[in-house]
Every structure is written in C-alpha cells, then in structure tokens.
C-alpha cells in the first residue's frame, strides 16, 4: 500500500458519522487523512486511556484488544465499500477476515494509522479489502476483510 504524505483532514469525525452507523463507544475512526471513494482510505485512530476496554484489558498493562484493532480496520474498509458508485441501498456489514496477524502491541498514547484498499467487489454485494494498521511506521496488524450488503 502507498504511504500517505499528507496530514490534512479529509473527513472529520462528524463527516465519518454521516457515512458509518457506529457511535460511541464503538466509533473507532477519528479522522480520515486520505480517501479515494470506492478505492482506498487512510484513517487515524487515537488510542487513549479513557476508552472503556482499558478498565479490564488489562488494568496493570493496558493493551488495545486485537478484535478492536480489526474492527477499526473494518470501519475504514466500510468507508471504502459504502462509497462505491451505483450500489443498491443498504448496510454493509463486516462478514469475515482472512490472514489477520498482530505484529506489535497497541497501547494508550499510540496513534493507529489504518490503510485499506479495495481488492474486489462481487455482484455489488460482497466486498474485500486489504487492511493494515501501523504505529509510528511499525506494522501492528494486517489482513483481508470481507463485507456483505444487507438489505
């Protein structure tokens, strides 16, 4: 995937809320810094100690749960598939994962940079994206995510 060289905000949290159904505490995309609708997106997730999962995961050594890293990547992927032209109305839901690997811990204070690229769209209902999340340029998580359109 290509490295974004801009720090400009392309989509604000308010604009993201207009595109995705997720709300606090499950809205995991803070801003989008690069977006080619229907093709790719790069977004930021600022990880803070104030997030509810850190009360129990783990109090003495807080780590962002891997499932939430994957969900953050899926939300960025959702920004891509929901912006595809000529798609029927409905809700794209997270439908599967392939080859996901966790490479480093993500802790409060980290900033996840999440990049997703559309790999395929079949029958205007099933999408697949390649996703990766990095912290300070180091790969934290990567894999392929699938989406399905529900009417």
Swiss-Prot record:
In its keyword annotation, does this UniProt entry include Oxidoreductase?
no
* Catalytic activity reported: a (3R)-hydroxyacyl-[ACP] = a (2E)-enoyl-[ACP] + H2O
- Enzyme superclass (EC): lyase
Q: Where is the active site?
A: 57
- Keywords annotated in UniProt: Cytoplasm, Lipid A biosynthesis, Lipid biosynthesis, Lipid metabolism, Lyase
**Localization annotation:** Cytoplasm
Source superkingdom: Bacteria
**Gene Ontology MF annotations:** (3R)-hydroxyacyl-[acyl-carrier-protein] dehydratase activity
Q: What is its EC number?
A: 4.2.1.59
Q: Which GO terms describe its biological process?
A: fatty acid biosynthetic process; lipid A biosynthetic process
Any keyword RNA-binding? no
One Pfam family linked to the record: FabA
Q: Which GO terms describe its cellular component?
A: cytoplasm; membrane
Principal cellular location given in the protein's record: cytoplasm
Family statement drawn from the similarity comment of this UniProt entry: Belongs to the thioester dehydratase family. FabZ subfamily.
* Function comment: Involved in unsaturated fatty acids biosynthesis. Catalyzes the dehydration of short chain beta-hydroxyacyl-ACPs and long chain saturated and unsaturated beta-hydroxyacyl-ACPs.
The protein's name is 3-hydroxyacyl-[acyl-carrier-protein] dehydratase FabZ
Q: Which organism is it from?
A: Synechococcus sp. (strain CC9605)
UniProt lineage? Bacteria, Bacillati, Cyanobacteriota, Cyanophyceae, Synechococcales
């Amino acid at each position: 995937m290509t490295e974004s060289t801009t720090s400009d905000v392309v989509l604000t949290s308010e604009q993201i809320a207009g595109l995705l159904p997720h709300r606090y505490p499950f809205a995991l995309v803070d801003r989008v810094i690069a977006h080619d609708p229907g093709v790719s997106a790069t977004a930021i997730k600022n990880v803070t100690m104030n997030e509810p999962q850190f009360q129990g995961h783990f109090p003495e050594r807080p780590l962002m749960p891997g499932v939430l890293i994957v969900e953050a990547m899926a939300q960025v992927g959702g920004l891509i598939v929901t912006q595809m032209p000529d798609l029927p109305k409905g809700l794209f839901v997270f439908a599967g994962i392939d080859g996901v690997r966790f490479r480093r811990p993500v802790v409060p204070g980290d900033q996840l940079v999440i990049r997703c690229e559309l790999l395929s769209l079949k029958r205007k209902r099933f999408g697949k994206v390649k996703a990766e999340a990095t912290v300070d340029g180091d790969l934290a998580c990567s894999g392929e995510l699938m989406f399905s359109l529900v009417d």
